[in-house]
Structure formats: C-alpha cells, structure tokens
Amino acid sequence: GMQDNGSWVGPSAVWHAGGIRNEDWQEVLFGDGFDVQPTGDGEVYAMYQGGALNRVNLTTLGSTGIQPASPDTADLRFAWNAALALDPNDRDGLYFGSNRVHYSPNRGRTWETLSPDLTTNDPAKLEQATSGGLTIDATQAENHCTILCIAPSKVRPNELWVGTDDGRLQHSADRGETWTDHAGQLKGLP
C-alpha cells in the first residue's frame, strides 16, 4: 500500500525487457493502502485505514467490505494498519485483528471472534471520555490498545501468537479457547 494512494498489486517478475514497469501495477483499493494478500483465485484482500478490510476481484475490481462487525457486547478498536494474516492451514481462512482476534473460514463472508480483548484496555491510553478512544496526535486517526500482528502456526493448526500496540504478547495453543500473556517474559525485551 501507499500512503494516500491506495493499495496496488504488481508482479515480482516480468518477461519483457527493462524489468517491472509502472504499467505492470494495478490499483485495487483506495485510501491509505496497506496489505494486499492474494487468495489464489483472482482475488486479493486489501485494506485501508481503521481496519476497513475488503475482498477485491482483480478482473472486475469490484470490492466487498468484509470487516468483522462488533458483537453486541463489545466495541471493537482497529489499528490504523490492522493485523491481517492468512490461515496457513486453510486456503479460505483469514485472521483479522481489532482488540480481539477474528477468524473467517470463508474469505470474510462470516466471522467468529476467537478471543476476548487481548490488550491492556487501559483507560488512560484509550481516553474514551475525551476522544472516543483516539490517541490525539497530528493525524487524529490512531486508535490505541489494538492488535498489530497475528501469527498463526504453519505446523500447529490451533496455535496463534498475537502482538498488541500496548506491549502484550499473547499466545493460544487451542485456537483461542485460552490465552497466555508473555509480555515481560522474553529475555532482552521490556
């Protein structure tokens, strides 16, 4: 993705002389572009700020918004550049992060929530009463206490590692049934 210039896809190699050219690239989504993840079937996942996740058809460029909705009992907070990971054990599976881990077994058509809030949910960092949860900075666009990285295991299908922007490192060995916070337990890191 490119700041203020959308999400683009392009080849890693070409057959014509001169290497990869500007015309080899194609814009697939607008906004502040982030991840573009291929599905393998002529579609990609593309996202812009605030976790606005889309599934895009590369032939028609038609896009479908697939961001998980908030369950009745919880407000979701998405990072400016939300966590996105393809399931290495299921080609249709997709993990997505807010302050919770979400999983779709069918390319974003439906979602299940695999975790509680895995962040500190620190009111001082959230400042809900004064800012609605936005961290006041020059952009006025940053949510805090959000998941930044999701790493599903390639060899243990039920294992997940999750990192948050407020210092948590969460691990689940049972696909989100239980979570252990490893923050402060890694040698050489705060």
Predicted regions and their residues:
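Beta-propeller blade termini and top-face loops
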Residues: 1-190
